[in-house]
Amino acid sequence: IEKGHVFANNSDTEVLIHSYEEYGKDMLNKLRGMFAFVIWDSEKETLFGARDFFGIKPFYYTVADGNMIYGSEIKSILEHPAYKKEVNPVALENYLTFQYSVLDETFFKGIFKLMPGHCFTFHKGELNIERYWEPTFDADESKSLDEFVDEIDDVMHDSVEHHKISDVEVGSFLSSGVDS
């Protein structure tokens, strides 16, 4: 708003468009939270998209007949007439061996997941993917256990405060499982 952007509604999604207009790809360094999005840049005739740091929101894609087909679920790509369904034996073998796929490949040949912390541009049939975020682990061994506990507490409170900001109601479900 301070930089002259006019918002048409109260959706937090509109912030992405204005952030892209203002900062371009560097907008990703200013985002916090879970997201997967695509923006069409009509001036550059380029599709730009990204996935959140931890990959909470899914994003799948393929390139067929010079077009990028994408979605939050693989089934939407499978239904597209330009995609020819074929099993990916490499991904299947990895999954059956490790019970998890660490690769960007899926069970379907040519369909990939955009990895966490990655963004892409698609211009004139050419897909370019790059990593925009990587975790850093700088252990400060001079701190005491109590200092670490206080720092974690501060970070958790800060994170919860930031995630309460939304254009829809926010809630929390605690199931008593290990991830709650």
Predicted regions and their residues:
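Cysteine-centered catalytic environments shared across enzyme families
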Residues: I1-S180
